[in-house]
Amino acid sequence: MWIQVRTMDGKVAHTVDSLSRLTKVEELRKKIQELFHVEPGLQRLFYRGKQMEDGHTLFDYDVRLNDTIQLLVRQSLVLPVPVPSSSGGSKERDSELSDTDSGCGLAQSESDKSSNSGEAANEPEGKADEDECDETELGLYKVGEYVDARDTNMGAWFEAKVIRVTRKAPAHDQPSSSSSKPEDDIIYHVTYDDYPENGVVQMTSQNVRARARHTIKWEDLQVGQVVMVNYNPDLPKDRGFWYDAEILRKRETRTARELHANVRIGGDSLNDCRIVFVDEVFKIERPGEGNPMVENPMRRKSGPSCKHCKDDERKLCRMCACHVCGGKQDPDKQLMCDECDMAFHIYCLRPPLSSVPPEEEWYCPDCRIDSSEVVQAGEKLKESKKKAKMASATSSSQRDWGKGMACVGRTKECTIVPSNHFGPIPGIPVGTMWRFRVQVSESGVHRPHVAGIHGRSNHGAYSLVLAGGYEDDVDHGNSFTYTGSGGRDLSGNKRTAEQSCDQKLTNTNRALALNCFAPINDLKGAEAKDWRSGKPVRVVRNVKGRKHSKYAPIEGNRYDGIYKVVRYWPEKGKSGFLVWRFLLRRDDVEPGPWTKEGKDRIKKLGLTMQYPEGYLEALARKEKENSKQAALDKEEEDGEEGFTSPRKGKRKSKSAGGDGSSRGTPKKTKVEPYSLTTQQSSLIKEDKSNMKLWTEILKSLKDGPKFLSKVEETFQCICCQELVFRPITTVCQHNVCKDCLDRSFKAQVFSCPACRYDLGRSYAMTVNQPLQAVLSQLFPGYGSGR
């Protein structure tokens, strides 16, 4: 196993090989020291946002093959010579290495402290500006008068009552200006009629005016007039709050009256908004026009604060009241969650609280994060319940199982088709070869790392590996007899064992039996009359089957095409126990890779053995080290022989280029171009909106199977990172899945996900049918499960 280690700035990177999943972090530090020349004590290693600590293994951090670990080098501080002070003491600096040395610490720097102290010094001046002087008979509106107060965040006007009037004291460093109005220094302390829980709110004179009390009739409304209307910016057809608006136009028909206005929301304006409630247009009261309103006035209608219960006090509501019981009683005993903004009675919590906690922030049980579960920098990992149940956790064996390629885990996953896909994988021709089983899993041909059959007992088998693990297997190439799984004791994390009991037609055995085009029979088995109508099974042959079959590959794993189950039956195997046998026969249009036609096709397609990324480089480094060690050992042996016997004459060494020049440069194999059907070519021509992309893609036809990879890369959805399904080709020439664009519009994002071009709220999503049709033909079955 090998991984990549890279410095945090990305300038230096090295490959660390000869590792195991059970390699300790402290052992990894020693290997990093050899490559980066950094002492283990100065290394900070990060993987997936976690700081790796000694005492854990790579398996604990789930480090996989060819993953990247970041290295941050701590600063090595040198102790200065102590300087004696006038008081006889000495100034000492802490030599201890800390996380702040690397620039990632939480400690406060001196500059931060000085800046904070400056803020603290300026704080009394800010408070001095906000000092208020209580006076009587101030302002236009007196104590007890009903007014309209504007919420500065929403820009809407709410009904309120004046509780107190004060004057703001002038600032010490700001002389009074003769141009300023006396009303500008007045502060009104008001309470909202509908929101008493907000308490007393301070308002400047610009945000307070006389209570609107006169409605304007339809006949008296004029264009350009500024009035107060009810409007809902989020849902324009519903009742909302009260805003100032300038009338643009009005139109009256026999059945309806339309009023359009520019609604003023704070400093912004919503243009050309249709006002629904045309009978509730209020005149804006100017100062001094009417008598002060000190008696309880008529209330205006506003939109309900809760859309679920419509502010009905008799209804239980878990959205605006207690999220547990839905009751609206005891508001003083409710807590608001600072994360989800839901209310909870203190006696509805489990366990209940006796009183309201004094903390400013409070989180409900669903939003609360248990601090004991958080792994902070420098702390050990918490015990994993999942890994504690693994067989490797309870095994007493000292064997290092972490070096096997079956244990490294997948670095990528096949998403072009779902895991329960029957039939061939698009872009994987017959004869494709992989060095390790984990690569076969990554390609999607056979997903399990170790198991021989991939399937579900209620659906069928999707693929199997013929590896010669059972002595009862018989391989004839175009057909073979496969032995079912089970009947072996694999406790203790074993990969294989001798047959120790009878097999049963359950689990994957039953899944493989379901592929046979015949009714299931748990006792005697069954045989299909029309075997070609059965479900297809992808078959992979492994090099281990070479001991039983001449059709197995010489190296690694090879995809041999589609087979169908002809019959299955139980019989006593060579071990003396009952085993289930399955007869499979090849049903694939592509020739078998062991035939002459198949071998020629493999050459034409340019199919070669596929290795994991970095495998050949790691192998070359290992061979280089072994050759160096062998050369050193030989020199030592030659030196010892020199003292005992005379050296023999050296043979003339070959020139470096002598042998290679005779052979010359190997001839490059010509790859068979990928051929499109007539229907596929016509569909590509119909897709005029993507003609530029197709022109570039069609240049890859000469590369054979790589053409499909080019198509998949070009038509990848930027949202889900998958091949586009039901594609929408936008006006800006980008292709997005319809479902992805629907989710974007539901989130009120009406722009192209790729370039942020404004598509508009009313954008018509039309599926590009020619593109969808050609993708479905190139990648059959890729839309299943999407």
Curated annotation (Swiss-Prot):
Site feature location: Required to discriminate between hemimethylated DNA versus symmetrically methylated DNA: N493
Subcellular location: Nucleus
GO molecular function, one term: histone H3K9me2/3 reader activity
UniProt site (Required for affinity and specificity for 5-mCpG sequence): R495
Residue numbers bearing the Phosphoserine modification: S76, S98, S102, S302, S372, S645, S655, S662
Post-translational modification: Phosphorylation at Ser-302 of the linker region decreases the binding to H3K9me3. Phosphorylation at Ser-645 by CDK1 during M phase impairs interaction with USP7, preventing deubiquitination and leading to degradation by the proteasome.
Domain YDG: 423-586
Record-annotated site: Histone H3R2me0 binding: P331, Q334
Region of interest: Required for formation of a 5-methylcytosine-binding pocket: 470-473, 482-485
Positions of region (Histone H3R2me0 binding): 337-341, 357-359
Region (Linker): 300-305
Gene3D superfamilies in the cross-refs: 2.30.30.1150, 2.30.30.140, Phosphatidylinositol 3-kinase Catalytic Subunit, Chain A, domain 1, SRA-YDG, Zinc/RING finger domain, C3HC4 (zinc finger)
Binding site for DNA: A467, G468, D473
Pathway: Protein modification; protein ubiquitination
UniProt domain Ubiquitin-like: residue ranges: 1-78
Region called Tudor-like 2, residue ranges: 220-287
Region Tudor-like 1, residue ranges: 139-213
Zn-finger (PHD-type) residues: 303-370
PROSITE patterns membership: UBIQUITIN_2, YDG, ZF_PHD_1, ZF_PHD_2, ZF_RING_1, ZF_RING_2
Principal cellular location given in the protein's record: nucleus
Protein name, UniProt field: E3 ubiquitin-protein ligase UHRF1
